[in-house]
Regions:
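A short His-aromatic
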Residues: 91, 95
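A structural motif corresponding to the C-terminal end of an alpha-helix
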Residues: 150-153
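Helix-to-beta-strand junctions that scaffold the AdoMet/dcAdoMet cofactor pocket
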Residues: 96-97, 110-114
């Protein structure tokens, strides 16, 4: 973190309206739509983090209200009153010192039904000079898979997608590297039984 830089504690409108974020959310929602485990509509959902435009997209897809969280995800319990058949955590764990804590808390909040799912996305590892200064972790696939297993989840399916347009790649050497390395990993996870 550079001098004077502070971490964002709430999502602001300017950040939410960024076309890159909207593209990520659309691709994430397309992945969610591909799940055959959940019967629609579901009774309730939990979106980890503040309410964003993707929360409304999830509500429209699943046909229910999605609650959001407002606790310190590194240290505090989620303290939810209900158990959810679907939980989403899109690009959250890379911002945490202790992502295992959050995954264990999500497992407690997930409904025990075999069809319940956690949809999780995070940036794929990239060289240090391309990593975001706002991220504590950009994990290699094997480390992320180990974290998921340690938290008691199994991978139902996964995918990876790029977040840059082809024209962006032609703007220079560093943009070309970003097109090659800057990818999002997304998972559909089920609690191990």
């Amino acid at each position: 973190m550079t001098r004077g830089q502070e971490f964002r504690t709430v999502v602001d409108q300017r950040w939410s309206a960024d076309p890159a974020h909207l593209m990520r959310w659309e691709k994430s929602l397309a992945f969610v739509r591909g799940s055959s485990a959940l019967s629609l509509p579901v009774s309730a959902g939990l979106d980890i983090g503040d309410r964003t435009p993707v929360t409304a997209m999830l509500e429209a897809h699943f046909g229910c209200r999605f609650e959001t969280t407002s606790v310190d995800l590194d240290t505090e319990p989620l303290d939810v009153a209900t158990r959810y058949p679907v939980v989403t955590a899109f690009e959250v764990i890379e911002h945490l010192y202790n992502p295992l804590h959050l995954l264990l808390e999500i497992r407690k909040a997930l409904d025990p039904a075999p069809s319940s799912r956690l949809f999780l996305s995070t940036p794929a590892w990239k060289p240090g000079f391309l990593q975001s200064p706002d991220h504590f972790h950009e994990m290699q696939k094997r480390l992320l898979d180990a974290l998921i297993a340690r938290a008691g989840f199994e991978v139902a399916r996964s995918s990876e997608f790029g977040i840059r347009s082809p024209l962006f790649c032609l703007r220079g050497f560093r943009p070309m590297l970003r097109c090659f390395f800057e990818k999002i990993r997304i998972y559909e996870l089920a609690a191990q039984r």
